[in-house]
A protein has these predicted regions:
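Conserved donor-binding/catalytic core segment of Leloir-type glycosyltransferases
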Residues: 121-138, 143-146, 150, 159
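Acidic donor-binding loop of glycosyltransferase active sites
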Residues: 205-219, 232
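N-terminal pre-catalytic "stem/leader" segment of glycosyltransferase-like enzymes
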Residues: 1-51
Length: 320
């Protein structure tokens, strides 16, 4: 989608208007890796276009292995790169099984978020849910599930921060406009559209539950990382890389291809959590006051250290 070539960002048509997770990690990389290190490499952030002959080419994968753009890796095409970096071990293993590259040319550097886990007593008068990723990942299941929960629990509210503008694809919102309208018309839901990451993080800091009935396979999930570190109870299926991303800090249920079964599981688990919160005033803080929520491997310092070390080693080997 884009490339950091000798420290400069080379945008593509796909990336130039996007402010998604890949672009967020690209900026983390630029901000936390030494300039003298980046000047000696080309880091391609998924969907590479032009490879370079004067520096080592590193592929930084964010996409699923089955993405058609990965055709460049077929038939030993991965040999065009000096190294490949993945965002989860689950994703790495999917690529290795599909394309056959050796483990020795692969590294896993988990996504980093700037949120610092800082547990505190949250206001429990209204139990606030947040959905803060793109619509196609599960919003169509969340809305009816939440509407059913709101019939039984009158102190819950859902804030939705979602839209394809974050990728520069405003036109794709059209299919979800009826769903956005349904949210806006419900007294227990608010549709905010796409807001800055800073505004979303402020909302997470005041919220309690991230219910994510995910239907789009994730290679990692920045939204989940942000919610965990914001001291929220996160509820989601054990699908794709979500279990690895969650790092035992969440509540998971079994994935089901049938959307009705999936919605029923999400409803049942969340209803049980809300019942526990209603019956035990200490349940929420007892669950979220835990070192599990720290997610040390996902902090910016760890991310920067791993990238600096990896790129220095690759550069040294390339010069020999």
């Amino acid at each position: 989608m884009s490339c950091i070539y000798k420290g400069e960002v080379i945008e593509s048509e796909l990336s130039k208007n996007s402010k998604g997770g890949t672009e967020m990690m690209r900026q983390r990389l630029i901000d936390n890796v030494g300039k003298e290190v980046l000047e000696n490499v080309a880091v391609h952030l998924s969907r590479p276009r032009d490879l370079y002959e004067d520096v080592p080419n590193i592929l930084y994968c964010h996409d699923l292995s089955e993405d058609p753009e990965n055709v460049i890796l077929k038939d030993g095409g991965w040999n065009k790169f000096q190294h490949i970096v993945f965002v989860t071990a689950w994703q790495r293993d999917q690529y290795i099984m599909r394309f056959g590259m050796p483990y020795s040319m692969c590294s896993v550097i988990h996504n980093a978020v700037e949120v610092k886990y800082d547990p505190k007593e949250k206001d429990m008068e209204t139990i606030r849910f947040v959905y803060h990723t793109t619509p196609h990942r599960g919003l169509e299941l969340l809305v009816p599930v939440f509407a059913s929960l709101a019939k039984e629990f009158d102190n819950i509210h859902l804030d939705v921060y979602s839209g394809f503008e974050i990728y520069g694809w405003e036109g794709r919102n059209a299919a979800y406009e009826p769903l956005f309208a349904q949210i806006a018309e419900h007294s227990h839901m608010t549709y905010h559209g796409v807001k800055s990451n800073e505004e979303v993080l402020e909302a997470l800091d005041k919220s309690h539950i991230f219910l994510y009935p995910n239907i789009w396979k994730e290679t990692s999930c920045i939204a989940l990382l942000e919610a965990i570190k914001s001291q929220m109870i996160c509820i989601h299926p054990n699908y794709g890389a979500l279990p690895e991303t969650a790092a035992n800090a969440t509540i998971m249920y079994d994935w089901n291809e049938d959307l009705n079964h999936h919605a029923n599981y999400a409803y049942a688990v969340t209803r049980q959590v809300l019942t526990q919160m209603k019956n035990d005033p200490n349940y929420f803080h007892g669950f979220t006051f835990s070192d599990r929520f720290n997610l040390a491997r996902n902090n910016v310092a760890s991310f920067g250290t791993m990238w600096n070390t990896l790129l220095r080693n690759i550069t040294d080997a390339y010069k020999r």
